[in-house]
Amino acid sequence: MSKIKGKIVLITGGASGIGRLMGEMAQEKGAKALVIWDINQESIDATVKELGKKGTVHGYRVDVSRHEMVAEQYDKVKKEVGDVDILINSAGIITSNKTFDQCTEDEIKRTMMVNAIAPMYVARQMLPDMVQRNEGHICTIASAGGMMSNPKMSVYAASKWAAVGWSDSVR
């Protein structure tokens, strides 16, 4: 609890699913402020309204696969909310449930961008500030898909294996 209490927590993909649950848990553990990054404005608004009843919540529409947008929105968060103490990379997508030979180039690119490369973009923005303060935590949510093969979700599995390998390597 002491690692979250009084801290600013930023969660990518924080307006739904596991990201939203992580936000609820951060609030329960005493986070000073919760920052939600998500691509779906309607979900952001609903989450800010609901979780805002329990504490300070800020919502930003961010496509984490666009590094320029990540940099711009991170600067905005620092000005409007403060230094991020805890980053939870939770944004993720599944674009198909088919064998690799049936996946389109766009499905492959989008899945890898959001699930594998975006966590790196986001962490790369925040890590220098955390290092300078000698304080901060980065948590990347993957899935069992990052630990085992799945013939009908090979691209998803590859993206999550990449996220797991990268996260383990930078800790």
Residue ranges and their predicted role:
Residues 2-34:
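Canonical Rossmann dinucleotide-binding motif of NAD(H)/NADP(H)-dependent dehydrogenases/reductases
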Residues 31-46:
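Conserved glycine-rich Rossmann-like NAD(P)H-binding loop of the short-chain dehydrogenase/reductase
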Residues 41-42, 61-72, 105:
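The beta1-alpha1 cofactor-binding region of Rossmann-like NAD(H)/NADP(H)-dependent oxidoreductases
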Residues 98-100, 104-109:
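Substrate-binding pocket helix/loop in short-chain dehydrogenase/reductase
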Residues 100-101, 150-154:
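Active-site loop immediately N-terminal to the catalytic Tyr-X3-Lys motif
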Residues 123, 159:
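Active-site helix of classical SDR
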Residues 143:
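Residue(s) in the substrate-gating loop at a strand-loop-helix junction
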